[in-house]
UniProtKB/Swiss-Prot annotation:
Transmembrane segment boundaries: 62-82
Annotated protein name in UniProt: Uncharacterized protein C11orf87 homolog
Organism (species): Pongo abelii (Sumatran orangutan)
Subcellular location: Membrane
Topological domain ranges for the Extracellular compartment: 24-61
Length: 197
Protein backbone atom coordinates (compact mmCIF):
# COMPACT_ATOMS: atom_id res chain seq x y z
CA UNK A 1 0.00 0.00 0.00
CA UNK A 2 2.87 2.38 0.78
CA UNK A 3 4.40 1.76 -2.66
CA UNK A 4 1.12 2.43 -4.51
CA UNK A 5 0.43 5.76 -2.78
CA UNK A 6 3.44 7.60 -4.25
CA UNK A 7 2.57 6.32 -7.75
CA UNK A 8 -0.98 7.69 -7.46
CA UNK A 9 0.36 10.97 -6.19
CA UNK A 10 2.75 11.19 -9.11
CA UNK A 11 -0.10 10.66 -11.56
CA UNK A 12 -2.40 13.18 -9.85
CA UNK A 13 0.03 16.00 -9.10
CA UNK A 14 1.79 18.11 -11.74
CA UNK A 15 5.56 17.64 -12.28
CA UNK A 16 6.54 20.88 -10.52
CA UNK A 17 4.88 19.80 -7.29
CA UNK A 18 6.40 16.35 -7.60
CA UNK A 19 9.87 17.87 -7.97
CA UNK A 20 9.35 20.10 -4.94
CA UNK A 21 7.95 17.31 -2.76
CA UNK A 22 10.78 14.94 -3.60
CA UNK A 23 13.43 17.64 -3.44
CA UNK A 24 12.44 18.99 -0.01
CA UNK A 25 13.53 15.91 2.05
CA UNK A 26 16.94 15.85 0.31
CA UNK A 27 17.65 19.47 1.21
CA UNK A 28 19.12 20.05 4.71
CA UNK A 29 19.01 22.93 7.23
CA UNK A 30 20.97 26.06 6.43
CA UNK A 31 22.65 24.71 3.32
CA UNK A 32 19.31 24.74 1.55
CA UNK A 33 18.66 28.48 1.94
CA UNK A 34 20.31 29.26 -1.37
CA UNK A 35 18.21 26.60 -3.10
CA UNK A 36 14.99 28.11 -1.79
CA UNK A 37 15.58 31.33 -3.64
CA UNK A 38 15.19 30.00 -7.18
CA UNK A 39 12.41 27.66 -6.00
CA UNK A 40 10.35 30.59 -4.77
CA UNK A 41 10.22 32.06 -8.26
CA UNK A 42 9.02 28.79 -9.74
CA UNK A 43 6.12 28.50 -7.32
CA UNK A 44 3.97 30.84 -9.45
CA UNK A 45 4.38 28.69 -12.55
CA UNK A 46 3.56 25.60 -10.50
CA UNK A 47 0.28 27.14 -9.30
CA UNK A 48 -0.70 28.00 -12.86
CA UNK A 49 0.01 24.44 -13.96
CA UNK A 50 -2.16 23.07 -11.16
CA UNK A 51 -4.96 25.49 -12.05
CA UNK A 52 -4.81 24.54 -15.71
CA UNK A 53 -4.98 20.84 -14.87
CA UNK A 54 -7.93 21.37 -12.55
CA UNK A 55 -9.70 23.55 -15.10
CA UNK A 56 -9.22 20.92 -17.82
CA UNK A 57 -10.68 18.17 -15.64
CA UNK A 58 -13.56 20.41 -14.51
CA UNK A 59 -14.30 21.53 -18.08
CA UNK A 60 -14.38 17.94 -19.32
CA UNK A 61 -16.82 16.93 -16.58
CA UNK A 62 -18.91 20.04 -17.24
CA UNK A 63 -19.08 19.23 -20.95
CA UNK A 64 -20.20 15.70 -20.14
CA UNK A 65 -22.91 17.01 -17.80
CA UNK A 66 -24.14 19.46 -20.44
CA UNK A 67 -24.29 16.72 -23.08
CA UNK A 68 -26.22 14.41 -20.77
CA UNK A 69 -28.72 17.16 -19.91
CA UNK A 70 -29.21 18.00 -23.58
CA UNK A 71 -29.91 14.36 -24.44
CA UNK A 72 -32.35 14.08 -21.55
CA UNK A 73 -34.15 17.27 -22.62
CA UNK A 74 -34.43 15.98 -26.20
CA UNK A 75 -35.96 12.71 -24.98
CA UNK A 76 -38.46 14.57 -22.79
CA UNK A 77 -39.42 16.90 -25.65
CA UNK A 78 -39.92 14.01 -28.06
CA UNK A 79 -42.13 12.14 -25.59
CA UNK A 80 -44.20 15.24 -24.81
CA UNK A 81 -44.72 16.05 -28.49
CA UNK A 82 -45.72 12.43 -29.15
CA UNK A 83 -48.33 12.51 -26.37
CA UNK A 84 -49.69 15.88 -27.52
CA UNK A 85 -49.98 14.66 -31.11
CA UNK A 86 -51.72 11.50 -29.91
CA UNK A 87 -54.29 13.51 -27.94
CA UNK A 88 -54.97 15.75 -30.92
CA UNK A 89 -55.54 12.74 -33.16
CA UNK A 90 -57.98 11.27 -30.63
CA UNK A 91 -59.90 14.55 -30.48
CA UNK A 92 -60.08 14.72 -34.28
CA UNK A 93 -61.34 11.15 -34.48
CA UNK A 94 -64.02 11.87 -31.88
CA UNK A 95 -65.14 14.99 -33.75
CA UNK A 96 -65.31 13.10 -37.05
CA UNK A 97 -67.33 10.30 -35.44
CA UNK A 98 -69.78 12.81 -33.95
CA UNK A 99 -70.17 14.60 -37.29
CA UNK A 100 -70.82 11.31 -39.11
CA UNK A 101 -73.36 10.27 -36.48
CA UNK A 102 -75.17 13.61 -36.73
CA UNK A 103 -75.23 13.39 -40.53
CA UNK A 104 -76.61 9.84 -40.46
CA UNK A 105 -79.22 10.81 -37.86
CA UNK A 106 -80.35 13.87 -39.82
CA UNK A 107 -80.51 11.97 -43.12
CA UNK A 108 -82.48 9.15 -41.45
CA UNK A 109 -85.00 11.59 -40.00
CA UNK A 110 -85.43 13.35 -43.34
CA UNK A 111 -85.81 10.09 -45.25
CA UNK A 112 -88.25 8.70 -42.69
CA UNK A 113 -90.64 11.64 -43.23
CA UNK A 114 -91.50 10.55 -46.79
CA UNK A 115 -92.32 6.96 -45.84
CA UNK A 116 -95.95 6.15 -44.97
CA UNK A 117 -96.72 5.66 -41.33
CA UNK A 118 -97.84 2.24 -40.08
CA UNK A 119 -101.28 3.62 -39.13
CA UNK A 120 -101.99 4.57 -42.74
CA UNK A 121 -101.48 1.02 -43.97
CA UNK A 122 -104.33 -0.33 -41.83
CA UNK A 123 -107.20 0.46 -44.30
CA UNK A 124 -105.44 -1.27 -47.19
CA UNK A 125 -104.89 -4.31 -45.01
CA UNK A 126 -108.57 -4.32 -44.08
CA UNK A 127 -109.53 -4.12 -47.76
CA UNK A 128 -107.31 -7.07 -48.55
CA UNK A 129 -108.94 -9.12 -45.81
CA UNK A 130 -112.40 -8.27 -47.16
CA UNK A 131 -111.38 -9.29 -50.68
CA UNK A 132 -109.98 -12.53 -49.33
CA UNK A 133 -113.20 -13.29 -47.48
CA UNK A 134 -115.38 -12.98 -50.60
CA UNK A 135 -113.87 -15.92 -52.54
CA UNK A 136 -113.98 -18.00 -49.39
CA UNK A 137 -117.68 -17.26 -48.96
CA UNK A 138 -118.51 -17.88 -52.65
CA UNK A 139 -118.87 -21.70 -52.27
CA UNK A 140 -121.56 -21.06 -49.67
CA UNK A 141 -123.43 -18.92 -52.15
CA UNK A 142 -123.50 -21.65 -54.78
CA UNK A 143 -126.10 -23.96 -53.20
CA UNK A 144 -128.37 -21.06 -52.33
CA UNK A 145 -128.23 -19.78 -55.91
CA UNK A 146 -128.86 -23.29 -57.26
CA UNK A 147 -131.86 -23.73 -54.99
CA UNK A 148 -133.25 -20.33 -55.97
CA UNK A 149 -132.80 -21.11 -59.70
CA UNK A 150 -134.49 -24.50 -59.36
CA UNK A 151 -137.42 -23.00 -57.47
CA UNK A 152 -137.82 -20.06 -59.85
CA UNK A 153 -137.66 -22.09 -63.11
CA UNK A 154 -141.19 -21.79 -64.66
CA UNK A 155 -140.74 -24.54 -67.29
CA UNK A 156 -140.77 -27.42 -64.83
CA UNK A 157 -144.14 -27.80 -63.07
CA UNK A 158 -144.16 -29.21 -59.63
CA UNK A 159 -145.44 -32.83 -59.66
CA UNK A 160 -147.81 -33.31 -56.76
CA UNK A 161 -147.92 -31.09 -53.76
CA UNK A 162 -144.66 -29.19 -53.40
CA UNK A 163 -142.99 -29.82 -50.11
CA UNK A 164 -142.10 -26.72 -48.15
CA UNK A 165 -138.43 -25.91 -48.06
CA UNK A 166 -136.59 -27.29 -45.06
CA UNK A 167 -135.87 -24.84 -42.29
CA UNK A 168 -132.36 -23.39 -42.46
CA UNK A 169 -129.94 -24.81 -39.93
CA UNK A 170 -128.74 -22.70 -37.06
CA UNK A 171 -125.88 -20.78 -38.55
CA UNK A 172 -122.99 -19.26 -36.79
CA UNK A 173 -122.34 -15.51 -36.97
CA UNK A 174 -119.76 -16.11 -39.69
CA UNK A 175 -122.27 -18.09 -41.77
CA UNK A 176 -124.88 -15.36 -41.34
CA UNK A 177 -122.42 -12.78 -42.50
CA UNK A 178 -121.55 -14.95 -45.50
CA UNK A 179 -125.24 -15.45 -46.41
CA UNK A 180 -125.92 -11.71 -46.16
CA UNK A 181 -122.99 -10.98 -48.43
CA UNK A 182 -124.24 -13.59 -50.92
CA UNK A 183 -127.72 -12.02 -50.88
CA UNK A 184 -126.22 -8.64 -51.52
CA UNK A 185 -124.32 -9.95 -54.55
CA UNK A 186 -127.46 -11.73 -55.84
CA UNK A 187 -129.51 -8.52 -55.45
CA UNK A 188 -126.93 -6.54 -57.38
CA UNK A 189 -127.03 -9.15 -60.19
CA UNK A 190 -130.83 -8.92 -60.42
CA UNK A 191 -130.73 -5.14 -60.57
CA UNK A 192 -128.20 -5.30 -63.40
CA UNK A 193 -130.40 -7.71 -65.40
CA UNK A 194 -133.45 -5.45 -64.88
CA UNK A 195 -131.57 -2.40 -66.05
CA UNK A 196 -130.23 -4.19 -69.12
CA UNK A 197 -133.67 -5.46 -70.07
Amino acid sequence: MSARAPKELRLALPPCLLNRTFASPNASGSGNTGARGPGAGGSGTCITQVGQQLFQSFSSTLVLIVLVTLIFCLIVLSLSTFHIHKRRMKKRKMQRAQEEYERDHCSGSRGGGGLPRPGRQAPTHAKETRLERQPRDSPICAPSNASSSSSSSPGLPCQGPCAPPPPPPASSPQGAHAVSSCLDTAGEGLLQTVVLS
